[in-house]
Amino acid sequence: MDKLIIEGGYPLKGTVTVSGSKNAALPILIASILANKKVTLHNVPQLRDIRTTIKLLEILGCTIQQTEQCIELTPGTLQHEAPYELVCTMRASILVLGPLLAKLGKAKVAMPGGCAIGARPIDLHIKALEKMGAKFTLKDGYLIGDCTKLKGTHIYLDFPTVGGTENLLIAASIAEGETILENAAQEPEIEDLARFLIACGAIIKGHGTNVIHIQGVPSLNGCTYSIMPDRIEAGTFLTAAAITKGELLISGCPYKELEAIINKFMQMGIHIEKRECGIYVAPIKTLKATDVTTRPFPGFPTDMQAQIMALMSIAYGTSTVNETIFENRFMHVQELARMGANIRLNGHTAIVTGVKELKGAPVMASDLRASASLVLAGLAAKGITTIQRTYHLDRGYEFIEKKLNAVGASIQRTNE
């Protein structure tokens, strides 16, 4: 099993390029099964979750060719079953539920897996698809759905679920009639999915707002499309520059989508400039404490909570983090504490009192973003940090140690 060995204390300096967005690429890949002609996707990151999705789509009947960041998907005879051995490793697999029902009128999908960061229930997906005419049973760990034809309707989501909005957006694009999604998630990745579907011939209005109108069409065509940059990877690199008191130009970085993150970093005393080719982070001497509450977009993203907590751990003063999106998303706290961080938990709130320095230690990643926070802490720590379970990191970061080493980090990957 791979592990990362990080020698901390080196300020980062140089230019790092942001990869394509994992959270946009996954639903777009899955939506491609609705196309009746070849789909070509560019800027697709080379990640473990992408490879899992490709395997799943091949089992469902698609032919896929991949060359680095380009994927060509050719539709075939679509199958309706998503097997446990793939779905159990990646939560986004549940996104095949809506499109399979929309195109085939039936679906058999194993209950999903992925990061262990709380219940993350799929009941909102199921309730909404039932309102569109689907019926579901649960048998032997599989969710089995069937319908004559999904029909457009008015759906109010009790919570602006990202996965639920994506599932319904894809399914409604070839449903019969108009679907209105109210209280829809507004994340940029959903906008990217909508733009892809529109490029394939879907009729969608209001994407990027909390009310989306989808007029179903009989079928979707193929298209050529480029995946948006990964705002969470960009935010992670911003944090890497600040935590090492380094100087980075983050190329291909979406400024508008990062405003909630950038505003918090500026409150911490970090100097950030918008440049034509990306975002510049200047060296800093002292980090200030701040308070963060995770919210759906355009609020501060839960996927950056662990990373900013690593930064807070060496900031002057006491910071707080309120996690409102997922339960059990503080599993990185005890690992940061092993490195000397002073963090106290009170329910869904973490109180972080900054320390003078972190110290290298053996730590273990528990999920994707927790693993990123440990890498960041390791970059800043005095001494050697060893991170086990790097497969979590590989689910969402493309060549992270290579990118960081290229700007001055000292990270070695070993297999034991």
From Swiss-Prot:
Annotated GO MF terms: UDP-N-acetylglucosamine 1-carboxyvinyltransferase activity
Q: What is its main location?
A: cytoplasm
Which residues are recorded as modified (2-(S-cysteinyl)pyruvic acid O-phosphothioketal)?
C115
| CDD domains in UniProt | UdpNAET
Main enzyme class: transferase
Query: Cellular location of this protein?
Result: Cytoplasm
Catalytic reactions on record: phosphoenolpyruvate + UDP-N-acetyl-alpha-D-glucosamine = UDP-N-acetyl-3-O-(1-carboxyvinyl)-alpha-D-glucosamine + phosphate
Keyword check for Cell cycle, yes or no: yes
The active site annotation covers C115 (proton donor)
The UniProt keyword set, sorted, is: Cell cycle, Cell division, Cell shape, Cell wall biogenesis/degradation, Cytoplasm, Peptidoglycan synthesis, Pyruvate, Transferase
List the InterPro entries hit by this protein, alphabetically: Enolpyruvate_Tfrase_dom, Enolpyruvate_Tfrase_sf, MurA_subfamily, RNA3'P_cycl/enolpyr_Trfase_a/b, UDP_GlcNAc_COvinyl_MurA
Q: What pathway, per the record? A: Cell wall biogenesis; peptidoglycan biosynthesis
Q: What cellular component GO annotations does this protein have?
A: cytoplasm
Q: Which domain of life is it from?
A: Bacteria
> Record keywords: Cell cycle included?
yes
Q: Where does phosphoenolpyruvate bind?
A: K22, N23
Pfam families cross-referenced by the UniProt entry: EPSP_synthase
One Gene Ontology term of the biological-process aspect is:
peptidoglycan biosynthetic process
Residues annotated as binding UDP-N-acetyl-alpha-D-glucosamine: R91, R120, P121, I122, D123, L124, D303, I325
Per the UniProt entry, the Enzyme Commission number(s) are 2.5.1.7
- Purpose: Cell wall formation. Adds enolpyruvyl to UDP-N-acetylglucosamine.
Q: According to its UniProt record, which protein family does this protein belong to?
A: Belongs to the EPSP synthase family. MurA subfamily.
- This chain belongs to which protein, by name? UDP-N-acetylglucosamine 1-carboxyvinyltransferase
Q: Which organism is it from?
A: Lawsonia intracellularis (strain PHE/MN1-00)
